[in-house]
């Protein structure tokens, strides 16, 4: 890979926006400053005042491999990710087979090697009967342990109280949870099926997967974490109700200590609400459900106010045909990695928070939370995972979607910013119009 110098950039990093230059030597950031001069053999990239960010780290994706490659795979979805400025991803364990032991975990890493355009990590999964495997997790091998405390794909719903207690007691890595109470959901679903049959209106989804189901399950997770002093990260907060359960303040406190219990929300909870079901139907059916406009507003404020610590995508593609089945057969999940950062930048344009705050939630915080080694920041010596943002509007078109499923819930949406360039490990991966070069993603290292 060629060394290069980015000049005339507006660097966004660690709470600051400042004019400067950034040098990349090999796969690393070698210098950050002002007035840097090009060396022999260096390519000069003129940022022309555009914002230069560290690459985003998405701590929640479902790239569907192995077992569901007809709708997505590591190669296709990592391509969409780098086109969207996401340079690292952490993939969920509810594949087929699920990632419930070390052999399945290492199989995923082997699949990604040489095929992933973004850097990659894979979660270990918990089930009702793999506590011994959980106890043997290598903390350097995975970002964390995913516990589905709500309905999931495959044998991954953990609803045995003794097993849950043992998992929270014995895990050697952070626990990340999907919190919805399955019995509550099943009871409400039965009522709606009695009324509508299989073709339940999409706008009923947030009533079926209710805020009460979220709250009950989240309270259980918090109680177990406090009982065992477990490092807990609650995923995809979707309700205003849950926000009061979490500590307000920075992930890393002024004294250097960190929150033990953290929470994340996702881009679709910032950009959609109940009113959008009429237009988009099952395209925005996801678990937990997109809820009311008041929830959307409260979640946006909570992200700005440091109640929520991380922004992610929960990218979960399904085919267009699957999404147009009747409600009970239409799967939950939507493709998001390609347009997540540009969608989040709309919150910046709207004044909800600044670019530096967005970078904190979508790059710095995931790196800190999961102890990702030398990524997530613009720092000398760190890997050169970079994103150049251009404030030129564009409209999402289906023909530009890179995810294998071939559609986006943002089709027809005009965003005020676009991704001009993405670099992964010092190599250009996206030039603003097309993918560039070979897959350069590497296995994420966890500095534990």
Where are these regions (language model features)?
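Divalent metal-coordination and catalytic microenvironments
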Residues: 9, 27, 49, 60, ...
């Amino acid at each position: 890979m060629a060394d290069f110098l980015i000049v005339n950039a507006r660097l966004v990093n660690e709470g600051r926006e400042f004019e400067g230059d950034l040098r990349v030597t090999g796969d690393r950031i070698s210098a950050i400053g002002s007035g840097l001069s090009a060396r022999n053999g260096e390519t000069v990239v003129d940022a022309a005042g555009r914002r230069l960010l560290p690459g985003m780290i998405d701590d929640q994706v479902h790239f569907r491999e192995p077992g569901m490659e007809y709708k997505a795979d590591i190669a296709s979805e990592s391509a969409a990710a780098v086109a969207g400025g996401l340079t690292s991803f952490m993939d969920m364990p509810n594949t087929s087979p699920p990632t419930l032991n070390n052999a399945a975990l290492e199989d995923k890493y082997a699949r990604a090697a040489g095929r992933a355009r973004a850097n990659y990590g894979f979660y270990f999964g918990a089930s009702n009967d793999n506590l011994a495997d959980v106890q043997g997790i290598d903390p350097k091998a995975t970002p964390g342990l995913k516990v589905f405390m709500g309905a999931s794909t495959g044998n991954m719903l953990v609803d045995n109280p003794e097993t849950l207690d043992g998992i929270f007691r014995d895990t050697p890595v952070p626990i990340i949870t999907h919190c919805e109470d399955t019995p509550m959901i099943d009871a409400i679903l039965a009522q709606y099926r009695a009324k509508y049959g299989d073709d339940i209106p999409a706008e009923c989804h947030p009533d079926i997967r209710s805020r009460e189901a979220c709250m009950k399950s989240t309270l259980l997770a918090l109680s177990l974490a406090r009982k065992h002093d477990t490092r807990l990260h609650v995923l995809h907060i979707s309700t205003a109700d849950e926000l009061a359960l979490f500590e307000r303040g920075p992930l890393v406190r002024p004294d250097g200590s960190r929150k033990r219990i953290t929470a994340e929300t996702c881009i679709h909870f910032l950009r959609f609400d109940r009113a959008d079901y009429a237009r988009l139907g099952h395209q925005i059916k996801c678990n937990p459900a997109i809820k009311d406009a008041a929830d959307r507003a409260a979640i946006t404020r909570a992200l700005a106010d440091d109640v929520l610590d991380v922004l992610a995508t929960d990218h979960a593609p399904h085919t267009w045909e699957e999404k147009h089945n009747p409600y009970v057969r239409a799967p939950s999940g939507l493709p998001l990695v390609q347009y997540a950062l540009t969608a989040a930048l709309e919150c910046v344009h709207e004044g909800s928070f600044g670019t530096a705050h967005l970078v904190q939630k979508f790059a710095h915080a995931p790196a800190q939370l999961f102890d990702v080694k030398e990524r997530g920041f613009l720092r000398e010596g760190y890997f050169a995972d970079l994103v150049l943002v251009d404030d030129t509007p564009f409209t999402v078109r289906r023909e530009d979607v890179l995810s294998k499923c071939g559609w986006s819930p943002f089709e027809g949406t005009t965003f005020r910013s676009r991704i001009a360039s993405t670099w992964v490990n010092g190599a250009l991966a996206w030039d603003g119009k097309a993918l560039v070069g070979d897959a350069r993603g590497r296995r994420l290292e966890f500095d534990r």
